[in-house]
Amino acid sequence: MKLINIWLLLLVVLLCGKKHLGDRLGKKAFEKASCPSCSHLTLKVEFSSTVVEYEYIVAFNGYFTAKARNSFISSALKSSEVDNWRIIPRNNPSSDYPSDFEVIQIKEKQKAGLLTLEDHPNIKRVTPQRKVFRSLKFAESDPIVPCNETRWSQKWQSSRPLRRASLSLGSGFWHATGRHSSRRLLRAIPRQVAQTLQADVLWQMGYTGANVRVAVFDTGLSEKHPHFKNVKERTNWTNERTLDDGLGHGTFVAGVIASMRECQGFAPDAELHIFRVFTNNQVSYTSWFLDAFNYAILKKIDVLNLSIGGPDFMDHPFVDKVWELTANNVIMVSAIGNDGPLYGTLNNPADQMDVIGVGGIDFEDNIARFSSRGMTTWELPGGYGRVKPDIVTYGAGVRGSGVKGGCRALSGTSVASPVVAGAVTLLVSTVQKRELVNPASVKQALIASARRLPGVNMFEQGHGKLDLLRAYQILSSYKPQASLSPSYIDLTECPYMWPYCSQPIYYGGMPTIVNVTILNGMGVTGRIVDKPEWRPYLPQNGDNIEVAFSYSSVLWPWSGYLAISISVTKKAASWEGIAQGHIMITVASPAETEAKNGAEHTSTVKLPIKVKIIPTPPRSKRVLWDQYHNLRYPPGYFPRDNLRMKNDPLDWNGDHVHTNFRDMYQHLRSMGYFVEVLGAPFTCFDATQYGTLLMVDSEEEYFPEEIAKLRRDVDNGLSLVIFSDWYNTSVMRKVKFYDENTRQWWMPDTGGANIPALNELLSVWNMGFSDGLYEGEFALANHDMYYASGCSIAKFPEDGVVITQTFKDQGLEVLKQETAVVENVPILGLYQIPAEGGGRIVLYGDSNCLDDSHRQKDCFWLLDALLQYTSYGVTPPSLSHSGNRQRPPSGAGLAPPERMEGNHLHRYSKVLEAHLGDPKPRPLPACPHLSWAKPQPLNETAPSNLWKHQKLLSIDLDKVVLPNFRSNRPQVRPLSPGESGAWDIPGGIMPGRYNQEVGQTIPVFAFLGAMVALAFFVVQISKAKSRPKRRRPRAKRPQLTQQTHPPRTPSV
């Protein structure tokens, strides 16, 4: 009976233990996904924004009370005819303080009232109120196969789909992997990221983020979450009456920064300030962010994490407020975006100079596929983008706090961003002289200490991987100074300096522009003293290059730019070799104390330059890319070129050879062509230097002077290759949509390309495109091709070569959901100008085969064949003798495509006057003129290796000695078949803190083991008591054998 009771007791203990473990595993499984297949899905957090009709943000020149703001608006509107207006109340924690903006509602559509407001001396700007949406969407985790539906199905959202990048991806949100480097399953393994970056070394030195105020702008945080002990304040900026996190994203971000147990954060003792700026329906407004930003300034926040972003770097109220935040010493850390591996996909505000933009890597130090790539596109078309991201860190499979406790693993740059924010918070707590900490000094320490990843260019990794301990060493001995990003220019260093290293420079070429960021750790404002100085090294042929400068007149806040144009002197037109020199700039900032009357702090920085020069290539090998006539979002609604890609409605990557046409550029370079970029009108280049002008996906209009000059250039030997795209006003009206939230129609400003403008350009040669819209797969010259939402050729000279194909009428499918097949659609035309020495013209109706954004089948082979034709006059036999060659269309009876009535292209065009009515061109702008710097030659040898870790002045890392602590590193076990990615990875325990995960798991198994052992001994004792006693037999005397010692056998 006792034995039965013992076994019953053991069974109860085992069942209780099984239930306890099952509850924990079930909770994790629920947090991971709600369906068994979720480990194979991705849940993308996408952002979109709309303009709220009738609502406007009125920004003032200073901070005023509510009464004063009301008075300013009332007096401004008094003289106008606007009567139906009101100030929208904002009930949030900042309502009791002065503000620099107001939200008003004007029900009348007259713009006179807005203009009257802007005329008021205390009003800075009036901009539309924007509504921000965040949506969670499951999709296949394989990003290679694009969304390509076989039948048209128009499913517009009720908000303007200005696509915001996925900044949070995780198991539970998304499952992500890094780059597949070999033929094996590569999973994002959840890690204790704080200890992987050796934060435990600083913990054991006594630094845990104490006395540092860190703000998390996200979805809120529950009041009694077990992971946080120092939540100083929770504020709600939404229209919902709750402070709790109903989604889990804000909890996760806060946990990565400051969790004190289980999945430990970097700075558990930091003061957490939680700003709930998104509702449970994932909606926010620009005004909510502005109020919250103002409150963050008021609360003297030290570090602010913003794990959101989007492509709209022209949302002026938001951008201006970010500048104001950093000017008030708030260190902002923001996610760079999840639109990789495509280039030119950086998100705002992470692409701003004063913000630390963070990209993502996996735990094998591969750039995460989802991480957005540079360059910035603010500067196009006339300039060149800056280096971003600033640094990269772990963003795939990172563990953080669950919404109700426990841990979960997420991936995305919105995960990498709080990793850096947490590291910065920890670093700030180590600095004794807190007055030295500012957005510039922290950024300088991070990029100077970053570890460069091999085989990765600067537009993927920035300055490299976050190195927490080296950053600590730098900050510990930091002295205020200026620095540069990048810290040197080496156009021979590949792959890091791609694309600069991909093409040497030569005489007569377009100047190479390098956009350098100046970081000023001495003060929020600064200036460049005198002018930058160019000092060529004579022994290294530095006198063979010349440089010109453009730079910020004022460095604010904490930063500015230095644009360097590099060109080759005439004497080196036939020379080949390496040329070197350096630029010297001196930055000055006002002294902080008023006692120093007019005193300034100064810092002099050297920027080494190294370039490779070759003799000027022949004209036939030089291709000029037209950048000036490409338009993008922001600010206009320029639709995608492939209408099948409804999940990416905007053309926002810049259409540059180093962004979404990167693969095409790489191919042309591999074929021996030299590609230059024209960021000015056609009147600003010497056509005798180039064999082909390449115009791809052009949305801009043309000056009359450009049309006349291009005709002369083609007559004199310049060839023209045009890749067009769809344009159809009926389809444009169809793809407009009604926003139910704003009760407003959104209309494209043009089609995929501006066909009416192109036809005006081509009319002198009797050529033109139609407004037909076609799609389909076909074969040409034994190559598989795909025509994605392209147009056809409407007319072409009779002595030209025209290739036709059979396609589906996609326009009919869009407009009427009907399917029809059209034969003999003219898509490719080749024409030789009959005049002696004339050039050649090629037309093709679709650019998607060159564009990296949604390319399904490339047509690089066709581009090669066309350039052979335009450069050397050799018509490819595969085209001239093709069975698809047809008689060129005459265009008789076809009405040319017209510009859509009421379009707003004039608002964003560099060519058209900004007014309604018939389009009229502006006056032709002057061509850019560079003022070359006067050289100050140096008769000394240049340094042989320009790549060093960016050494800040007066910093000696050897003086800052780190203690030799033995820290536990997370152990990784291999992935079993069918196992999910949400693993429990053992990690070290923070000194002085109880690891709840280990504390929950180990006692359970210890208790079960003790009970099993106890039961075993009880059973043995019971058996022994019930066994009858035996008389011990007398021991027998052993018999002697001949073999006294056993044989020796080898021990194993």
From Swiss-Prot:
Glycosylation sites: N148, N236, N305, N515, N728, N939
SUPFAM superfamilies recorded: Subtilisin-like
Domain Peptidase S8 per the UniProt entry, residue ranges: 190-472
Site keyed Cleavage: positions: L186, R187
Means of activity regulation: Inhibited by divalent copper and zinc ions, but not by nickel or cobalt. Inhibited by its prosegment, but not smaller fragments. Inhibited by 4-(2-aminoethyl)benzenesulfonyl fluoride (AEBSF), a serine protease inhibitor.
Basic residues biased stretches: 1025-1037
Active site residues of this protein: D218, H249, S414
Membrane topology of the entry: Single-pass type I membrane protein
Annotated transmembrane regions: 1000-1022
EC number: 3.4.21.112
PTM summary: The 148 kDa zymogen is processed progressively into two membrane-bound 120 and 106 kDa forms in the endoplasmic reticulum, and late into a secreted 98 kDa form. The propeptide is autocatalytically removed through an intramolecular cleavage after Leu-186. Further cleavage generates 14, 10, and 8 kDa intermediates.
Intrachain S-S bonds: none
Cofactor(s) recorded in Swiss-Prot or TrEMBL: Ca(2+)
Protein name: Membrane-bound transcription factor site-1 protease
